A protein has these predicted regions:
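ATP-dependent helicase/translocase motor core
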Residues: 2-298
Length: 298
């Protein structure tokens, strides 16, 4: 590892992972320690092309949808890892988003002695959006991912129940945040596109400035998250924005809320655009919903 890489890891990557772990309750691993790619390994990957952590997905399927035949879980996992090369990245992302929100439809026969023995259709949940504690949030640093032609190592991937929902590219303080977008993120979209099939948020930061967007967003449509509450003051010019973004978007309950309720696929003349709500929209809508809930409970 060169000096610049060491500095980037020591000054930005490691503290970001530590913040997710200590402040927001995420598990955190350094993929340099992954070791042999075997099912019993650190992440359960058996090939460096794999971006979905199937061991965690299966564990979540069993945990959130208990009492079903094993064939139901296996069928759901097959749908999760399925990759259709005839579809665009945006089409795949929209398809996976439906599975994320609505669950995976499976068909299976009732187990003998527990049902009628008939074929049953059921949607299996991949995530418990109501109880964050029933999900596994895992930050993985420096995971090697192999694409059709290239091998890449993203800085940090945020997994929920084995699904790579968050991509974070980090630069040193003195490097402009645009570099993370132009030199790294755009390259990863081209060289390891399957990493983004499940992506919900793209985050770029140099430790001070921090911005987020969707997989279809141009750099002009990456935004900052400056407030945790509508009444919070505007952060000063010397205040680092990365901790605010992490708290505002990657707090476990907030992340699930954003993924479930604040993502939109919009068909435009230029194609389908994926839109993630901006800071003020998220806070404003939730304030209205809280007020309505309070009024109905009186």
């Amino acid at each position: 590892m060169g000096k610049s890489e060491y500095s980037e890891d020591a000054l930005i990557q490691a503290p970001t992972a530590e913040f997710l772990h200590q402040e927001l309750g995420w598990d955190s691993v350094l993929a340099q320690d992954e070791g042999p790619l075997v099912a019993e390994g650190l992440l359960g990957r058996t090939a460096d092309t794999q971006v979905v952590l199937t061991r965690d997905v299966l564990a979540a399927l069993r945990r959130l949808n208990p009492g079903l035949p094993e064939a139901a879980y296996t069928q759901a996992l097959e749908a999760v890892v399925q990759n259709d090369s005839t579809k665009t990245l945006v089409q795949m992302n929209q398809e996976k988003y439906r599975l994320l929100r609505d669950g995976v439809l499976v068909k299976f026969r009732d187990a003998p002695g527990t049902g009628t023995g008939q074929m049953v259709e059921k949607r299996l949940r991949l995530i418990d959006f109501d109880q964050p504690g029933r999900n596994r949030f895992l930050a993985v640093r420096e995971l090697w991912v192999r694409g059709p032609l290239h091998l890449r190592r993203p800085d940090l991937i945020g997994y929920v129940n084995g699904l790579p929902l968050v991509f974070i590219e980090l630069k040193r303080f003195e490097v402009h945040v645009d570099s993370a977008y132009k030199q790294n993120y755009r390259d990863y979209l081209d060289t390891i596109p399957h990493l983004f099939h499940w992506n919900a948020l793209v985050v770029i930061s140099n430790g001070h400035d921090a911005q987020y967007g969707s997989i279809t967003a141009t750099k002009e449509h990456f935004y900052r998250w400056k407030r945790l509450d509508e009444d919070d003051p505007e952060p000063g010019p010397a205040q680092p924005l990365l901790p605010l973004l992490l708290q505002g978007m990657l707090d476990q309950r907030r992340l699930l809320d954003i993924v479930e309720n604040f993502v939109l696929f919009d068909a435009t003349e230029d194609g389908v655009q994926k839109i993630v709500a901006r800071n003020h929209q998220y806070l404003g809508v939730n304030r209205v919903m809280a007020r309505l809930t309070s009024e109905t409970q009186r």
